[in-house]
């Protein structure tokens, strides 16, 4: 069970996920979006998302991203589908399909998400950022010879990196090399706050620690791009 919200009258929205052992979906596997009405002392099913995923996988998906906004609209990912469920109107809509593990990046409070529009990182030239409170969307694109990927969020400011397509590669063990040539930091409205690039240098990896973005730099040596330090 996962608590979503409780108002001052004691009404509660919550999730039940895994094997369902009662109600009209008894015997099925999935996620129930439920409402408890304090006045009538009744539990009502708002929506049901059926899945063959095991409990641990559902838990992992919900812990990675699930968000209830101030208008009682709930967002979650299940089997690569981004669901938008209006708890008051009892309507479920799929906003995006085919998401893979790293396709979606969320801010710390999960109120803002960024989606890489191509499943294949080698082809991705567009990122869509969505403010889940206002519903506003911002799109960031790059040229045909470039690729972009999400880096993360500093508070509610979004960071993404741009790389030359010819330098993006995947090793035999599955590790993706994405040497970034330019970092973009934008606000919730898509306005550029800061950009970082240095001639002849690449950003090999990044890590966000609190309000600090740490970058490991690299340069081309003997035909290969290699790490040189921070």
Task: Map each language-model feature to its residues.
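Short, surface-exposed linear patches
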Residues: 97, 160-163, 181-183, 206-208
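Generic structural motif
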Residues: 15, 31-33, 204-206
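Short, surface-exposed loop/turn motifs at beta-strand boundaries within globular domains
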Residues: 6-9, 26-27, 99
């Amino acid at each position: 069970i996962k608590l979503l919200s409780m108002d001052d009258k004691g009404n509660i929205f919550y999730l039940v996920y895994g094997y369902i052992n009662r109600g009209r979906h008894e015997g099925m596997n999935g996620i129930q979006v439920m409402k408890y009405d304090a006045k009538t002392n009744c539990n009502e099913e708002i929506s049901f998302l059926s899945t063959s995923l095991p409990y641990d996988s559902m838990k992992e998906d919900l812990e990675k991203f699930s968000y209830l906004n101030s208008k009682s609209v709930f967002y979650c990912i299940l089997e690569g589908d981004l669901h938008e469920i209006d708890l008051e109107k009892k309507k479920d809509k799929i906003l995006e399909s085919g998401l893979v593990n790293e396709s979606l990046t969320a801010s710390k409070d999960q109120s803002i998400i960024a989606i890489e529009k191509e499943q294949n990182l080698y082809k991705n030239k567009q990122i869509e950022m969505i403010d889940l409170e206002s519903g506003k969307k911002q799109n960031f694109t790059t040229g045909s010879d470039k690729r972009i990927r999400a880096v993360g969020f500093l508070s509610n400011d979004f960071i993404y990196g741009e790389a030359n397509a010819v330098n993006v590669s995947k090793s035999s063990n599955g590790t993706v090399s994405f040497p970034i040539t330019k970092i973009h930091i934008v606000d919730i409205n898509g306005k550029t706050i800061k950009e970082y690039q240095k001639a002849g240098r690449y950003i090999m990896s990044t890590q966000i620690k609190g309000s600090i973005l740490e970058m490991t730099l690299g340069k081309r040596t003997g035909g290969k791009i290699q790490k040189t330090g921070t």
